[in-house]
Amino acid sequence: MMTDLESRVSRKLMLRIIPFVMLLYFVSFLDRVNVGFAALTMNKAIGLSPTAFGLGGGLFFIGYFLFEVPSNLILHKVGARRWIARVMVSWGIVSLASAFVVGPNSFYALHFLLGVAEAGFFPGIILYLSLWFPTRQRAVAAAWFMAAAPISGAIMKLPPIAGLADWQMLYILEALPAVILGFFVLKYLTDTPSKAQWLAPEERDWLIAKLKTEADARQSHAGHTAGALSALRDPRVLALALIYFGTSADLYTLGL
């Protein structure tokens, strides 16, 4: 059973962090799948064949795959809060530029760049959650965060505004929140529990001690710091990767 102090800290973490990161992931997933909705009118407008459209959609994941690990290596250097903000602003700008594609080549380039820009966001948030939530609450926190993805599929048809087609307005109106939220991340999120002024001193001290105890226990159990190549050979990592592959395939199939 949770102690009263543990219960208070858990409640504050859930209320302060989870709704906000859910909003970030909602916007993230919206920007990924909006191409499927935009295609209803965009393909004809810019002369995009179904094959070219499929290739452009695939290029997003190539950029995402190639730059996800480098992005997370940088994230560890500069901190999750700053890097998440950078990711959101850059993908918002690229998504905004997608409203002005004129043909297959610009469509290909921008969707590849969108994957590059967005690489590292999801694992960056997972890392951020691990800096705040003890092991006991971490799975619940991650589950709430991931619940934002399927919700983002509900999009209404947007009317043309100021001479722009509806698919252009879709890109613009879904890109702007990413840019705005990217800057807001810097103000709202706190780097580490030691800097959390929204926790009472005793709550902050308990959380820091709890996370340190768990980290020391993991380090003692592991006996060494495993590198990326060692992780890729771990059957548990491969099994989790396969599970995530299946989950992502389902979500993107429904979204697109």
Spans of model-derived segments:
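Extracytoplasmic
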Residues: 16-50, 156, 254-256
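Extracytoplasmic gate region of multi-pass secondary transporters
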Residues: 35-36, 229-256
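Conserved MFS/SLC helix-loop-helix module at the cytosolic interface between two early adjacent transmembrane helices
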Residues: 66-105
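Helix-loop-helix hairpin linking two adjacent transmembrane segments in secondary transporters
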Residues: 145-196
